[in-house]
């Protein structure tokens, strides 16, 4: 399969009224080529971006006016040899010329754009989505753009109404646009099952596109179906090998399922793109699996490379890893370095973080003494923290509510809701379910300002002890 980088078209007409073709031309072309088995269209703004996308061919297009009609000139370049493979020109309306170019590039795989009306296509290209739909009520791409524009303008209810109108049209074009509108509709309505169904349909219609695969993988990972998520990430990476997010999320999915060797290999590959974040992610995966010495080593490497990375969070996580590895005095030394870093950055929460550390590690009196050192402007929050520690604040304990919070939490940042949910399960006599939730260790959350955060480790450790988990 050729990976075709499509650059913005260059307007050589001198007529600013045709500037819309600059971006709309590549968008139409990419849509007409999407889903084919021979050409994978990639939108690229520069040759550098095309190289990062592993493009094998580069498409350069300009357009002029000739005898009152538009003429698109194209040049297809081999990305490796920089030799021109094909050149030519096509006359007609923008829509006609781009569609003809799509068929030239992939005679068997190209499919028609979602409107055959050149005026509707022009209105869409200029951003006049409502007018485009009025000119062609079955113009799926225009509906999708109108829905997205409305949602981004802060009108989700109106966007849902537009999606309903579009989906009510039995003759809406095309199946790909319909699936995209179904995805937008489900997202706006917070319909998880609808989102999964839409992503599944998009992966069927455009199997060589990485976006739908990544969307579906994220849903599987959120549902803690890690093996299914990992398989989807691998499929996406087969299409886009240097997709940093896919590599990072794949590493987490592998680690969350306990497959540490494969996770390490994935993060090593990811490290070629984002070395510090890859090391930090590897440290978190080790931490979750109770490999505290390995976790600390990764966090320490990140901190040594760049003390400011993630506002010093790797150093904080190294302290927690060192403590859970069995050396509290050594962990205290690391935490003091982190608190000194925060103080140097004038972070007003430095004192509070120190108090949370003392409480989390079982030293309540020292935690209370630390709170007393907080600046006067933080007195109200510090009193609320004391109330939590005195047992005067309400701690969520409703089983159904905690289940919902846990299920909606990122698996790599679900420590507190997962711990509270496990507590509720134990109280309900569902110890096997609780035991499964305690398999992975919760990560310390840098940047969290939850007054309940300090309860996480004491309660998690108490649960493991009560359930006799080694």
Residue ranges and their predicted role:
Residues 1-298, 303-309, 314:
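Acidic, proline/glycine-rich low-complexity intrinsically disordered segments
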Residues 157, 193, 212, 222-225, ...:
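Alpha-helical protein-protein interaction modules
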């Amino acid at each position: 399969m050729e990976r075709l980088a499509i650059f913005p078209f260059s307007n050589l007409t001198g007529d600013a009224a045709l500037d819309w073709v600059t971006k709309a031309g590549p968008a139409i072309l990419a849509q007409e080529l999407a889903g084919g088995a021979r050409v994978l269209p990639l939108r690229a703004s520069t040759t550098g971006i095309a190289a990062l996308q592993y493009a094998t061919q580069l498409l350069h297009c300009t357009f002029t006016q000739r005898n009152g009609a538009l003429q698109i000139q194209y040049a297809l370049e081999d990305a490796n040899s920089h030799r021109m493979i094909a050149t030519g020109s096509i006359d007609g309306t923008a829509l006609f010329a781009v569609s003809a170019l799509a068929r030239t590039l992939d005679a068997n795989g190209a499919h028609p754009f979602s409107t055959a009306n050149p005026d509707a296509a022009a209105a869409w290209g200029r951003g006049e989505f409502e007018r485009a739909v009025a000119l062609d009520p079955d113009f799926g791409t225009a509906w999708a753009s109108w829905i997205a524009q409305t949602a981004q303008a802060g009108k989700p209810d109106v966007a849902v109404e537009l999606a309903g109108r579009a989906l009510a049209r039995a003759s809406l074009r095309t199946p790909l646009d319909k699936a995209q509108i179904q995805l937008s509709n489900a997202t706006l309505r917070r319909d998880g099952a609808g989102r999964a169904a839409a992503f599944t349909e998009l992966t069927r219609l455009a199997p060589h596109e990485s976006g739908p695969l990544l969307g579906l993988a994220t849903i599987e990972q959120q549902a803690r179906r890690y093996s299914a998520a990992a398989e989807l990430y691998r499929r996406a990476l087969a299409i886009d090998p240097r997709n940093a997010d896919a590599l990072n999320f794949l590493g987490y999915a592998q680690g969350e399922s306990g497959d540490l060797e494969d996770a390490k290999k994935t993060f090593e590959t990811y490290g070629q793109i984002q070395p510090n974040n890859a090391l930090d992610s590897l440290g978190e995966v080790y931490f979750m699996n109770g490999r505290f010495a390995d976790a600390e080593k990764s966090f320490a490497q990140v901190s040594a490379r760049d003390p400011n990375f993630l506002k010093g969070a790797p150093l904080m996580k190294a302290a927690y890893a060192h403590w859970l590895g069995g050396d509290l005095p050594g962990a205290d030394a690391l935490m003091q370095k982190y608190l000194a870093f925060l103080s140097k950055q004038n972070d007003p929460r430095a004192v509070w973080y120190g108090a949370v550390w003392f409480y989390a590690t079982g030293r309540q009196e020292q935690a209370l003494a630390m709170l007393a050192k907080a600046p006067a402007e933080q007195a109200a929050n510090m009193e609320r923290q004391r109330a939590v520690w005195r047992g005067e604040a309400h701690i969520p304990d409703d089983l159904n509510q905690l289940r919902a919070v846990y299920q909606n939490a990122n698996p790599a940042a679900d420590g507190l809701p997962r711990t509270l949910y496990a507590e509720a399960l134990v109280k309900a006599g569902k110890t096997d379910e609780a035991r499964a939730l305690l398999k992975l260790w919760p990560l310390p959350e840098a940047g969290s300002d939850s007054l309940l955060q300090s309860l996480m480790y004491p309660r998690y450790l108490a649960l493991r002890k009560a359930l006799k988990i080694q």
